[in-house]
Each structure stands twice: as C-alpha cells, then as structure tokens.
C-alpha cells in the first residue's frame, strides 16, 4: 500500500462538502457530519444538511456504499435517489453512535500509557475510505516534539474498550507531526505489526 499524501484527509475536512450527483451535476446537499464506526474503524456514511448558510438538517442520510467518489472538494453520488431515509441501517448507526463519538476519546497503548485525546480521524480516500489513523492532542508524551497535535497510525484491526481506544505500544516509533508524511508512517507501522520489522 503506497499512500500518496493527497489521498489522506481529516474527517472534519468533509463537513460542508457538497454532495453532487453524476446524473445532473447538481449539488443536492452538504455533509453535516461524518458517521464513523469506531468498532469497525471505518467510514459508514454522512448525515446531511440543506445547502446554503442557513441550511438545516435533512431527513435523509448518505451511506458510504452509495458514494461513487470522495474528493477534497465534493462527495459524488450517482443520483438523488441514493440518499436514504433516516429509518434505514445507517440512520440507526447514527442514532446509536451519538453517545460514542470518537472525537475527544482517550487513546491508550496496550501497555497502559495514555497518548492523548482524539481530535480528528484520518481517512485514506483511495479505492474506498479506510480510517488509517487519528490526530491526537493533549499528549504529554508525544506532542512536545511537535508543540501540538500529532498523527497516530492505526493497526488494520483496532481495539475499542468503553471510553478508550487501544493501540499497540509500538506506535511510538511511527507517530508523525505532519499529514504529508503520515501515509508512509501507516505503511511502516502496519508492516512492523505483520512482520516484526523495524
């Protein structure tokens, strides 16, 4: 997996993106929030709002399966019919996830060391969205080298324990302070976990 930096983005960067149909090129909604399944470490879809400054929440949601392409400037879908009413599975996930938002969750290593709190989720937008890391802050251990927030790569499977997200202690050697170098850090970290190589 060779990750080009332009394929990585923070989940919060998607908020406000227009949802555009390929059918007519019409912007039919805006992303209100990103629905992230912390247990699966995956992007499930989006809640939506009407376009414009005063656009309120929409009753429909957009499941990831309906997204044709996700870019830095828009979310592309085939047609307006791809939006689902809130009584479907994604809507249920949205409802259930309100009490377990990953933002502000504590990140611990499997050795019991506190790394900080999640401030954002990093998504690889290649063939399909994959959550590959967290941006964290509030770390006395990691942030002195960057003065603020750092990027922590995630393993291919993630342990979630109540309020905390658990990552392998080996993550220390793969933390970066810039998004541009983060893709390579994710690759090296996952390779290290698979093979034990440094």
Predicted segments — roles?
Residues 1-198:
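Peripheral interaction segments used for macromolecular assembly
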């Amino acid at each position: 997996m060779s990750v080009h930096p332009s394929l990585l983005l923070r989940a919060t960067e998607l908020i406000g993106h227009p949802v555009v149909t390929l059918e007519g090129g019409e912007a039919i909604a805006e992303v209100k929030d990103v629905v992230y399944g912390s247990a699966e470490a995956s992007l499930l879809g989006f809640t939506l709002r009407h376009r414009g400054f005063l656009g309120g929440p929409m009753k429909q949601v957009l499941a990831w399966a309906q997204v044709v392409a996700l870019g830095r400037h828009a979310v592309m879908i085939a047609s307006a019919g791809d939006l689902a009413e809130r009584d479907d599975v994604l809507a249920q996930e949205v409802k259930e996830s309100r009490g377990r938002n990953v933002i502000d969750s504590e990140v611990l290593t499997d050795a019991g060391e506190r790394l900080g709190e999640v401030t954002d989720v990093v998504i690889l937008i290649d063939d399909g969205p994959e959550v590959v890391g967290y941006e964290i802050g509030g770390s006395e251990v990691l942030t002195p080298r960057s003065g603020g927030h750092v990027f922590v790569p995630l393993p291919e499977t993630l342990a979630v324990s109540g309020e905390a997200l658990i990552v392998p202690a080996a993550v220390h050697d793969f933390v970066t302070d810039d998004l541009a170098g983060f893709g390579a850090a994710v690759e090296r970290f996952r390779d290290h976990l698979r093979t034990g190589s440094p």
